[in-house]
Amino acid sequence: MKALAKLERGPGLTLTRVKRPEVGHNDVLIKIRRTAICGTDIHIWKWDDWAQKTIPVPMHVGHEYVGEIVEMGQEVRGFAIGDRVSGEGHITCGFCRNCRAGRRHLCRNTVGVGVNREGAFAEYLAIPAFNAFKIPPEISDDLASIFDPFGNATHTALSFNLVGEDVLITGAGPIGIMAVAIAKHVGARNVVITDINDYRLELARKMGATRAVNVARESLRDVMSDLHMTEGFDVGLEMSGVPSAFTSMLEAMNHGGKVALLGIPPAQTAIDWNQVIFKGLEIKGIYGREMFETWYKMVAMLQSGLDLSPIITHRFAADDYEKGFAAMLSGESGKVILDWTA
């Protein structure tokens, strides 16, 4: 089958031919329709330090997808040939304390599709049936293919009550932008997002941001004053991994505020702990998606009017993957979709 793989230890990916995956007793085989390019895939493309330490070579990658079940293992129940599915990209052990307690997103033995094992940038993907998730017919293939990052945004944004609250989001990547739409959809009052990328800040405005702030030109404090915010933000969603963004967030939080961290800052990042301790801030680390509560919430929000369509800005045939990665690398894109049926 055709697949997009890391064949050698260096930058780039190669469209190649690989063996179609075998299907275990508890697996489903998915014929891929669409995939989306993730920031993780950009790290793999660039072959940065993280990728060099993490990605086995050779291996085909990718973990954001939608497709159709074409084969099932003999032990699989609850699915049928022809079901349209996306799937949870974190494969968990099922035996550790968190898995057995129903907290699979906290599994200490997680294996990542397209990171630690063969991925979805291919004509077929085999995964455990437990990880597959049926997509309702009213949700398009394009939207279904971005359920993985949409789930990151949902898990982060819904970690705390947002109804009537003022929300600060630092980092206008696709996940941060989707978090804007989620926060407004569930009833936040002011949703302010910061970045230095004007293209993506404009996308955030289209997704409903109260203010999209280029912090290279505009003061967050001035924006807060314009919005008549006298006490600071109630909820912070840190999506960038940029130390200065996290610092500014802590300074802008109200006493008793709550912060969810999805962005990954450098290991030795220092912060002013006085901002945390004396403000009584609650800080929560976010990884992946809750299995499968996050997935059900994603579907429910889309079915109740959440519009994520502006975040998908580019579409290419899978054979034109280099154009897709170029769009992502330019910084002037939202989500980029690759069509494996074209």
UniProtKB/Swiss-Prot annotation:
Residues reported to bind NAD(+): 175, 195, 200, 262-264, 286-287
Gene Ontology biological process terms from the UniProt entry: L-threonine catabolic process to glycine
Reaction catalyzed: L-threonine + NAD(+) = (2S)-2-amino-3-oxobutanoate + NADH + H(+)
Domain of life: Bacteria
Gene3D superfamilies cross-referenced by the UniProt entry: Medium-chain alcohol dehydrogenases, catalytic domain (3.90.180.10), NAD(P)-binding Rossmann-like Domain (3.40.50.720)
Active site feature: 40 (charge relay system), 43 (charge relay system)
Subcellular location(s) of the protein: Cytoplasm
Enzyme class, broadest EC rank: oxidoreductase
Keywords carried by this UniProt record: Cytoplasm, Metal-binding, NAD, Oxidoreductase, Zinc
Zinc recorded as keyword: yes
Site (Important for catalytic activity for the proton relay mechanism but does not participate directly in the coordination of zinc atom): 148
Pfam entry (one): ADH_zinc_N
Entry GO terms, CC: cytoplasm
Biological or metabolic pathway of the protein: Amino-acid degradation; L-threonine degradation via oxydo-reductase pathway; glycine from L-threonine: step 1/2
Names of the cofactor(s): Zn(2+)
An example Gene Ontology molecular-function term: zinc ion binding
Positions of Zn(2+) 2 binding: 93, 96, 99, 107
Binding site for Zn(2+) 1: 38, 63-64
Cofactor detail note: Binds 2 Zn(2+) ions per subunit.
EC nos: 1.1.1.103
Protein function: Catalyzes the NAD(+)-dependent oxidation of L-threonine to 2-amino-3-ketobutyrate.
Record family assignment: Belongs to the zinc-containing alcohol dehydrogenase family.
Quaternary structure and partners: Homotetramer.
Protein name (database record): L-threonine 3-dehydrogenase
Organism: Burkholderia lata (strain ATCC 17760 / DSM 23089 / LMG 22485 / NCIMB 9086 / R18194 / 383)
Taxonomy of the source species: Bacteria, Pseudomonadati, Pseudomonadota, Betaproteobacteria, Burkholderiales
Gene (UniProt): tdh
